[in-house]
Amino acid sequence: MQQPNKLTPFFENLNFERDDNTMVINFGPQHPSAHGQLRLVLELEGEQVVKAYPDIGYLHRGIEKMAENMTYNEFLPTTDRLDYIASTANNYAYALAVEKLLGIEAPRRAQVIRTMLLEINRLISHLFFIATHALDVGAMSVFLYAFREREFGMDLMEDYCGARLTHSAVRIGGVPLDLPNGWIEKMISWCDKVDHELEHTYNALLQENRIWKMRLEDVGVISAEDALSWGCTGPMLRGSGVNWDIRKEEPYELYGELDFDIPVSDRCDSYGRYRLYMEEMHQSTRILRQLVSKYKESEPQLMAHAPQYISAPKEEIMTQNYALMQHFVLVTQGMRPPKGEVYVPTESPKGELGFYIKSEGEPYAYRLKCRAPSFFHTGLLQEILVGTYIADVVTIIGSTNIVFGEVDR
């Protein structure tokens, strides 16, 4: 019987007991600074890294295959479990791809609410990055302050949808709920607090901190050419001097109507990326303030009108026979998009997050592919870690801001 060819990682047969001066160690997958289930096989000469092999797959759940066996609406909550630090960004990217496939557009008010939720999630994710990155380097106090501000953002999400981490706050065709009473005032108050704390607390603790700068400056240098060739996006790409943001280049929702800047750093190191994240948070609060007036001007319609794909409002389902029958069919059998394929990119807090969907006219996707930014940034580690010291490995991993829910999928 012919033996099938087995594809094995090229580090599987590494000899950990060497006679020369090199040493091979495992970093992770249980290491607290691995930012998830990351295993790094590091080959060292003294304290200097000469080779680095990222080993992924410890969190693989077969999410893309699950999409082929679930209706389009059933699959949406599963996207929460990709980048679980900013789950609404995943919900939205998937919903937008399905909407493009269906040829529908969310109502104006739903677009305003979605944009608000996306920027709140961007702030939550960036605060989490600052907190964990500072903790990795040893700045414990910044971790506590950043988690305090993040908690208020999670409270806003809980007030809106009832969930704090995995939100499922977006629907295909719109949003399920209008904003609660007093929610906008809480959001503006939070934005004011975030801006104040960024300027007077985080900058005071970090920006000119001698130890912080020594740990980050000229560490994890990524040239613009390397960033582009490895497929980097988001802050990892803009931190290398490349001005590219999907919200500006291919605007979606209301981003084309909003006035905001795209921070870019030409330092190309970990310190430049840290400064870029700080400035992006200021831009997110700026966007949120602009959305308040647009919300008040919009009509209170939350879901697109497309009876063949989307259920009618609850009031119509309870009073109209046709709406009830259509709702029953959509729930039990699922919507049937037309045949075709679509890829839609969005700007998640970590970079370009896009979904490719191929439809054969059935209630289930024939193929779904998630283009997650953390996957590409993890691959980059095998290049930027070479030549650095073992003490800087944690700093570099932290500055890439990878989350393994969207790496392994």
Curated annotation (Swiss-Prot):
Which domain of life, per UniProt?
Bacteria
Q: Which residues cross the membrane?
A: none
> SUPFAM superfamilies in the record, alphabetically?
HydB/Nqo4-like
Where mainly located?
membrane
Which reaction equation describes what this protein catalyses? a quinone + NADH + 5 H(+)(in) = a quinol + NAD(+) + 4 H(+)(out)
Enzyme class, top EC level, equals: translocase
State the UniProt keywords alphabetically: Cell inner membrane, Cell membrane, Membrane, NAD, Quinone, Translocase, Transport, Ubiquinone
Instruction: Give an example GO cellular component term for this record.
Output: plasma membrane
**Matches recorded under Pfam families:** Complex1_49kDa
GO molecular-function annotation terms? NAD binding; NADH:ubiquinone reductase (non-electrogenic) activity; quinone binding
Location(s), subcellular: Cell inner membrane
List the EC numbers from the record. 7.1.1.-
How is it placed in the membrane, per its record?
Peripheral membrane protein
Q: How does it assemble?
A: NDH-1 is composed of 14 different subunits. Subunits NuoB, C, D, E, F, and G constitute the peripheral sector of the complex.
According to its UniProt entry, the function of this protein is described as: NDH-1 shuttles electrons from NADH, via FMN and iron-sulfur (Fe-S) centers, to quinones in the respiratory chain. The immediate electron acceptor for the enzyme in this species is believed to be ubiquinone. Couples the redox reaction to proton translocation (for every two electrons transferred, four hydrogen ions are translocated across the cytoplasmic membrane), and thus conserves the redox energy in a proton gradient.
Similarity comment: Belongs to the complex I 49 kDa subunit family.
Protein name per its UniProtKB record: NADH-quinone oxidoreductase subunit D
Organism per entry: Sulfurovum sp. (strain NBC37-1)
Q: Which gene encodes it?
A: nuoD
